[in-house]
Regions:
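Residues at the starts of beta-strands that form the adenosine-phosphate
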Residues: 5, 34-36, 65
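Portal/gating segments that form or line small-molecule/metal binding sites
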Residues: 38-39, 44-96, 100
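Short, flexible loop segments at the rims of nucleotide/cofactor-binding pockets, characterized by
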Residues: 13-17, 67-72, 101-104, 162-163
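C-terminal and late-domain segments of enzyme folds
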Residues: 1-32, 44-60, 90, 138-140, ...
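General beta-strand structural signal in soluble alpha/beta enzymes
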Residues: 8, 67-68, 92-93, 124-127, ...
Length: 232
């Protein structure tokens, strides 16, 4: 599992430049002078209000093109969607409802295309639900009346993931993950977990942030992630 590259962001401010160091990492991982970017706002029910912020950020970082694909309204066939996804160097998934995202991706063929993109060495990035989607499972408040639930995801990273972990409500992940068969990764706003070149590392924005490992082999002991602890 060392072809593709993943940047999973727990949350944070995009418009104010807080997360620019993380976006710089995303673009650098593409290893292209002027990478092409595709944005998938699926988790936000394909609302595009915030897309201009992403387009501005990636443009400032030298990306040659930025395209938003609203899968639920674009009317693309599975083959057309696959071609769009594989044409990009960077695919960025926005936040919202993780269960909705996975349902749409599974039904549309996007899930298979994104797995193929990973194998082809593309950079897969995203925030909140758009970060959880790359893991085995995500922990999201997309259940009935905003309740938390686990959602099966793409399985490219081998843990349960929880974003926004500095928030007390999201820390319900700590007891909840004990019911799972795998360890948990929890990302605070401002923090991201990066997978590249066969190794993991945490990266944070200008205001800092921590990525936490809840290790099942150690009774879900909580440890800040550094460059060493996941690469042993």
């Amino acid at each position: 599992m060392n072809k593709g590259k993943i940047v999973a962001i727990g949350g944070g401010g995009f418009e104010d430049g807080e997360m620019m160091p993380v976006f710089e990492k995303i673009v650098a991982l593409s290893e292209k002078e002027a990478p092409k970017v595709i944005s998938l706002p699926t988790a936000g029910h394909d609302h595009t209000d915030g897309e201009w912020v992403l387009e501005k950020i990636f443009g400032e970082l030298g990306c040659s093109s930025f395209k938003t694909i609203t899968i639920t309204t674009a009317g693309l066939s599975k083959e057309e969607l696959r071609a769009e996804i594989l044409s990009a160097d960077i695919i960025f998934a926005g936040g919202g409802n993780l269960e909705f995202l996975m349902n749409v991706w599974n039904e549309s063929g996007a899930a298979d295309a994104l797995r193929e993109a990973f194998e082809a060495g593309k950079v897969l990035a995203g925030v909140s639900s758009g970060a959880m989607c790359w893991f085995d499972e995500g922990y999201d408040d997309c259940g009935e009346n905003g309740s938390f639930m686990f959602v099966d995801c793409l399985g490219l990273l081998p843990w349960c993931n929880c974003p926004h972990f500095e928030n007390a409500g999201w820390q319900s992940f700590i007891p909840a993950v004990r019911s799972r068969l795998r360890s948990g990764i929890a990302c605070e706003n401002g923090a991201a977990l990066v997978w590249a070149d066969g190794k993991y590392e945490p990266v944070c924005g200008r205001l800092g942030g921590t990525v936490w490992l809840l290790n099942r082999e150690k009774n879900f002991e909580m440890t800040p992630v550094d460059k060493e602890c996941l690469n042993k």
